A protein has these predicted regions:
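Catalytic metal- and UDP-sugar-binding loop of GT-A-like glycosyltransferases, i.e.
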Residues: 8, 113, 421, 466
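Conserved core of the sugar-phosphate nucleotidyltransferase
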Residues: 121-247, 264, 274
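Conserved N-terminal catalytic core of the sugar/cofactor nucleotidyltransferase
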Residues: 1-7, 14-25, 30-114, 118-124, ...
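Noncatalytic nucleic-acid binding interfaces
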Residues: 463
Length: 486
């Protein structure tokens, strides 16, 4: 029995601003421990017994491709990274994964996992995965419902029906329910047959494709067309951009799962019947970490219920989350607050209002401010740069190029650049000349001059770049060669 882990990494996590941003969302962040949420998701399946485990498959937006590839490399977990040219929700993403997994006539069991969830009890998770694999192997579509701990209004619910198989705890899916109001959620908790919708699924690749053919043939056709026009590109699998842009947007639940629940009474010998939908209860410390209050709930706390990370001082505080990326945070006599510091933004919010952080991000976008979408520190396939200072006609950046990293051969129409090597060795191409710079050496790149920066060494290259000119935007780059295919 071959299980193909499929990690869906398309979310933006705007409610965890300012740490999570559009160009560097929460699944890429190490919010709990040293691993990012994506790395923790991949690591969660390690050691599942009774099956063969395929290398991970990640479906993601093109903007995240290099960071995800690097995070998998650091784990020693090379896998397939399927790139969506544009976001089309989870049903098309899973359909692309099923098509990728079906290459060479394979038909593995897909273990579908959002990249940005937390599961504390990995052993409990692996136990239900083994149960789900046995049912999925027989043709069922399996989802895992979280045993509710409170009348939560922020999650959708699954109502479980009749028992499906023994000794498994699996039950037929009776129906899917949208996020309820508080009174309805309280009644669900008392009734006992309702589970939180986790977004975790298992099914054979062929079963999912057949279900899409029955429920959303338009999505299946668009994905098949995009897949047929695709190509391998280093670590990545690209699909046809225009074909995928024509694909309708829909979620796994709306496209297939709700229809499966509605036809639960259809006879199995009816050739038009959809696969059986099954839900298995999961109690494993699950959270979708959808907002700051949810993160506070899963992080270790002191005796006063506080979470403090980074340079933080708390005096007479209760139930407060304080996270610092650099500068000192000092809180005195506060309760139920979220305080988050980054290089370019500070958030202060009451824990009861963390769902409204998204409104701040929306306001930043309307005002055209970059803080809503990008961090001051920006990651590139060759390393990173940090915007240290900026003013009229100048900008200062701290550039770090990883060992072996090579920037594109490029030129700028509107700016000149001064480069100062802080540590490491730089290989410089400037016009027709190539030379090396060491620590405390510098060079000047005139406006309009073709240039390239490389790190030929085995340690990171750190530089200070001072840009000057009439326009300093990142779109003033004309690339002539690029080893990363940008």
């Amino acid at each position: 029995m071959l299980i193909q882990p499929v990690v869906l990494s398309g979310g933006s996590g705007t409610r965890l601003w300012p740490l999570s941003r559009e160009k560097y969302p929460k699944q890429l962040l190490p919010l709990i421990g040293a691993d990012s949420l994506l790395q923790a998701t991949v690591r969660r399946v390690e050691g599942i017994t009774g099956c063969e485990l395929a290398p991970p498959m990640v479906v993601c937006n093109e903007d995240y491709r290099f960071v995800i590839a690097e995070q998998l490399r650091l784990m020693g977990k090379p896998g397939t990274i399927v790139l969506e040219p544009t976001g089309r929700n989870t049903a098309p993403a899973l359909t692309l994964a099923a098509l990728a997994a079906s290459r060479n006539a394979a038909d593995p069991i897909l273990l579908v996992m959002p990249a940005d969830h937390v599961i504390v009890d990995v052993a409990a998770f692996q136990s239900v995965v083994r149960q789900g694999a046995a049912l999925a192997e027989g043709g069922a579509v399996v989802t895992f419902g979280i045993t509710p701990e409170a009348p939560e209004t922020g999650y959708g619910y699954i109502q479980s029906g009749a028992a499906y198989a023994t000794p498994s705890a699996a039950r037929l899916i009776a129906r899917f329910v949208e996020k309820p109001d508080l009174a309805t959620a309280q009644s669900y908790l008392q009734e006992g047959s309702y589970l939180w919708n986790s977004g975790l699924f298992m099914m054979r690749a062929s079963v999912w494709l057949a279900a899409m053919a029955a429920c959303r043939p338009d999505i299946l056709k668009a994905c098949q067309d995009a897949w047929a026009l695709g190509s391998a590109d280093g670590d990545f699998v690209r699909v046809g951009k225009d074909a995928f842009a024509a694909c309708p947007s829909d979620s796994i639940d709306y496209a297939v799962m709700e229809r499966i629940a509605k036809q639960a009474g259809t006879k199995a010998d009816d050739v038009s019947a959809l696969p059986t939908g099954v839900v298995i209860p999961l109690t494993a410390g699950w959270s979708d970490v959808g907002a700051w209050d949810a993160l506070w709930q899963v992080l270790p706390k002191d005796s006063n219920g506080n979470v403090a990370q980074g340079d933080v001082l708390l005096q007479d505080c209760r139930d407060t989350l304080a996270l610092s990326e650099g500068r000192l945070i000092a809180c005195v006599g506060v309760s139920d607050l979220v305080v988050v510091e980054t290089a370019d933004a500070i958030l202060v919010a009451h824990k009861d209002k963390t769902q409204d952080v998204k409104k701040i991000v929306d306001s930043l976008k309307r005002e055209g401010r970059s803080e809503g979408s990008v961090h001051r520190k920006v990651y590139r396939p060759w390393g990173s740069y940090d915007g240290v200072d900026a003013g009229e006609r100048f900008q200062v950046k701290r550039i770090v190029v990883k060992a072996g990293g090579i920037l594109s051969l490029q030129m700028h129409h509107h700016r000149a650049e001064h480069w100062i090597v802080v540590s490491g060795t730089a290989k410089i191409t400037r016009g027709e000349e190539t030379f090396l710079l060491s620590e405390n050496e510098s060079t000047f790149i005139p406006l309009g001059t073709t240039h390239r920066l490389e790190n030929p060494g085995r340690v990171p290259l750190e530089m200070i770049e001072v840009q000057s000119g009439s326009y300093l935007g990142e779109d003033d780059i004309v690339r002539f060669e690029d080893v990363y295919g940008r």
